[in-house]
């Protein structure tokens, strides 16, 4: 058979993109690297999410630093998306789309207005870091970035080109270029709000039971969700017998009873899992959740961007879809079209979100204002807004157990209008929302699914 390699270029009203397609005799090929160089004009300004981990072990939760392109050096890795403003005012977002069976793209600079591509290598061997149940050490890495099919299309390299910042928010080129859905059976997929337990550390009060990870507390969450028309509640870390034993709940939790109780009130349950144990028995674990009547999973702490991890995301999307389960990828890289191919994939974190108000001052209104023009351009973003208690910069303090947000309550409400996520969290305690009924009523009524996007 004739061997072919082609470069496909496309131009759109909202940008330009290219990808490679191969038709090779070998069923499997090794990709040593992919060369990407972008030469930009002097004076371009960037919002640069600098990745300091040189092994690409990252949650993709950086601050977007405002830099001149000429200040970038080889050791300053940045992950996508990257926002660039030219001296003439054109706004460009650098992204990729249709990322499957291939590592994520990172960029570096050279102090000469050139951006160059880098990729995480194939991970041959890894292990858990001593003393942790989730952080990995990469023990052996290949000299290549992928082993893949000889006949295939590679990811799109995308420049989203916009006349102004308004057009940046409306640009959906990444979604346009992504592969179509693998299924037409989507009626069961229900976007919605989700009441979250972790941010508030289950601090409910004024109740006649002991608050904690137990059936009564989650019934309280279900009652709150039902009252405000919130479709789901999330049982985050702590519900299972162990972080690596995610096939059974702790004795204090009666999952079948919670599913029954929620079903009567039109509230579904979503369960948190670490990625590692899920990876080791994906089908078996999801079979259990399907049998229990669970509506979705939040998969957490992937922290990698290599080929194996990209394939893990797709495996989860497919296995969950086969069992009519929704998926929220937390501790993740950015979306690049997976949610189009598997429409049960509802949202991705890959952002420095509200959860870090528990340990940092970096999550402030300026940071939040940058996100719609940077991270959110890639796709749905699990920022987890909804703080009831708020403070200005002068009065803000860090409190992990009783967290507050930096900014106003009106700012928190506005995030529900601006931020896109098909599973949009209400991060705070139901008890706090009951004390702020106007706020709870307003944010719970803002839709999460749209037919058109306007800025």
Predicted regions and their residues:
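Catalytic domains of carbohydrate-active enzymes that cleave complex glycans
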Residues: 402, 411-427
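Short, well-ordered beta-strand segments enriched in hydrophobic/aromatic residues
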Residues: 18-22
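Glycan-recognition and catalytic regions of carbohydrate-active enzymes
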Residues: 428-454
